[in-house]
Swiss-Prot record:
It comes from the Eukaryota. Residues 79-105, 197-215 have a biased composition (Basic and acidic residues). This is Segmentation polarity homeobox protein engrailed. This protein might be involved in the compartmentalization of the silk gland. Keywords: Developmental protein, DNA-binding, Homeobox, Nucleus, Segmentation polarity protein. It comes from Bombyx mori. SUPFAM superfamilies: Homeodomain-like. Pfam families: Engrail_1_C_sig, Homeodomain. One of its GO terms (molecular function) is RNA polymerase II cis-regulatory region sequence-specific DNA binding. PROSITE patterns: ENGRAILED, HOMEOBOX_1, HOMEOBOX_2. It is found in: Nucleus. InterPro entries: Engrailed_Homeobox_TFs, HD, HD_engrailed, HD_metazoa, Homeobox-engrailed_C-terminal, Homeobox-engrailed_CS, Homeobox_CS, Homeodomain-like_sf. Expressed in the middle silk gland but not in the posterior silk gland during the fourth molt/fifth intermolt period.
Length: 372
């Protein structure tokens, strides 16, 4: 490996064209030759990537070139900067250029400010304790009336202030409190029942005077909260009623659970019955004189018609068989009503209790009731 030492002032060649502001040397006044600030190194071809004879010019900027009057004229060299020298850059492949570009973009887009909720903050054991401390300082509602002490009660007065304890202690205490109760009461109690039982265990025994007050707010709240459990039907309400105090009154809606098993159907609505249209009366048949005379003659001979006789009479008079049949029935009813005599067979059946077709008529003029 061949090195060319060009650092000595006597052997160094001129560094080439120099651009930039460099103070002119004092060639005439003083015989002063400053030390060169460039080092040129020649590398063999086995270490090169690009051209076979590649020369890398390594610039080592030192302090500005000294001068005899440096101590006096130090302010003149404040604007001194390294002269611009054309450097030979090595050749990179496309993959390397792409990698360098992606790395520069990633460094440019990397956020400098820390994220408030990063993974490190979340995994920290103190994460979330500030929220607990803030919520523990929230004040309850202000007292409004004399029954404030009865209506309002904090969640748990027995628990001390949790802000002075560590995270491990709070976690162990939370697990112990959760293990004290079965999950949801072993699926046999509702949430309201569990809360009622816990409040009953923690509360001191009430005085007799407070128990005698029927209008106390505590009894109202307890009855309302316990009454909210009975929404599954009248059978559940009756079972709860038997388990609780016999003198306790339940709200009326507890017993009104007729449609609880099928809530989608809803209450049944009674349809309004439409008024039936009046039956169209059959138009009265207008018989001619000849037809009436022939019908009266046949009725005088025999009050009852056979089927063959009725058919022949209908064909002779040009009437329907039903018209002739109805005329004979009406004629017999008029005679029976006018005479007032009963058929002896009908009287015998009525005596045996097998026949009773007595009709009650009320006359408009005399308003008397006649039983026929």
């Amino acid at each position: 490996m061949a090195f060319e030492d060009r650092c000595s002032p006597s052997q160094a060649n001129s560094p080439g064209p120099v651009t930039g502001r460099v103070p002119a040397p004092h060639a005439e006044t003083l015989a002063y030759s400053p030390q060169s600030q460039y080092t040129c190194t020649t590398i063999e071809s086995k270490y090169e990537r690009g051209s076979p004879n590649m020369t890398i010019v390594k610039v080592q900027p030192d302090s500005p070139p000294p001068s005899p009057g440096r101590g006096q004229n130090e302010m003149e060299y404040q604007d001194y900067y390294r002269p611009e020298t054309p450097d030979v850059k090595p050749h990179f492949s496309r993959e390397e250029q792409r990698f360098e570009l992606d790395r520069s973009r990633g460094q440019r887009l990397q956020p400098t400010t820390p994220v408030a909720f990063s993974i490190n903050n979340i995994l920290h054991p103190e994460f979330g304790l500030n929220a607990i401390r803030k919520t523990s300082k929230i004040e309850g509602p202000k007292p409004i009336g004399p029954n404030h002490s009865i209506l309002y009660k904090p969640y748990d007065l027995s628990k001390p202030d949790l802000s002075k304890y560590g995270f491990d202690y709070l976690k162990s205490k939370e697990t112990s409190d959760c293990n004290a109760l079965p999950p949801l009461g072993g699926l046999r109690e509702t949430v309201s029942q569990i809360g009622e039982r816990l409040s009953r265990d923690r509360e001191p025994p009430k005085s007799l005077e407070q128990q005698k007050r029927p209008d106390s707010a505590s009894s109202i709240v307890s009855s309302t909260s316990s009454g909210a459990v009975s929404t599954c039907g009248s059978s559940d309400a009756s079972s709860i009623q038997s388990q609780s105090n016999p003198g306790q009154l339940w709200p009326a809606w507890v017993y009104c659970t007729r449609y609880s098993d099928r809530p989608s159907s809803g209450p049944r609505s009674r349809r309004v019955k439409k008024k039936a249209a009046p039956e169209e009366k059959r138009p009265r048949t207008a018989f001619s004189g000849a037809q009436l005379a022939r019908l009266k003659h046949e009725f005088a001979e025999n009050r009852y018609l056979t089927e063959r006789r009725r058919q022949s009479l209908a064909a002779e008079l040009g009437l329907a068989e039903a018209q002739i049949k109805i005329w004979f029935q009406n004629k017999r009813a008029k005679i029976k009503k006018a005479s007032g005599q009963r058929n002896p067979l009908a009287l015998q059946l009525m005596a045996q209790g097998l026949y009773n077709h007595s009709t009650v008529t009320e006359s408009d003029d005399e308003e008397e009731i006649n039983v026929t």
